[in-house]
């Protein structure tokens, strides 16, 4: 990933404007390795959540130098009472008591999210041992959606070397969050995914995917993607959008010449909007496993601050890359 267009720019921007990122699983070996690398680069400061003694013991056990980073233990955090008070205010509609808030905030995922909410950190990366829901739920409850966003969605960035020597970079969404997004949500997701892709050097050309190409098939699912594409075109006239398209018509110039010769997107799409989470999750994993793409994500979109989720099967390199991506997004929210 280091030679991906856009990634070097992220690192350079972070060197000029360093950020602080929370890792909610401070004793995990992969997190410690990534934190050590980030500290060596001097452009990102990690906060490791956990018992200080346990974190230091784990770092020594695995052989990683985390000097220069910060360890914050929920059990002895000096601003914990302030955190409880703010949590109660944020969740007052649910009638949360201080006792309930304190208990919840002893959980690293909620504690770490509140560090971002309070401005102690700029971003958060979790999920090495948590489920996606355990990372996203605190973000929805505490960070909430940014102005103009009606939903939180996700994007995967897929990268592989090409014959030209430059990496091929694609964006896909929503592959992780919304089970069955509405037409309006799909239109918004298209914009968010396209904007995310720009950070990685993508000049977005957006395809709304279906089993039909511009009316070749019929059914509610086809209508949904066609209508979503039409709404997105109306809302974002500067963004090249086509839909509905079958995947071959979206990426193959030969197929596009036959099926939709007048489209400015068909045959050259690089940003793909799936009808639901089933298609999206299957699609990016096929690209990853059979197409030899490296997949980075899910990158959460639409929040007031960068909160991102790791796969529980991630390795340290993926943690390192996602930390840089997450922190860099703090410059653009």
Predicted regions located by residue number:
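Anion-binding alpha/beta catalytic cores of soluble intermediary-metabolism enzymes, centered on
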Residues: 2-266, 271-333
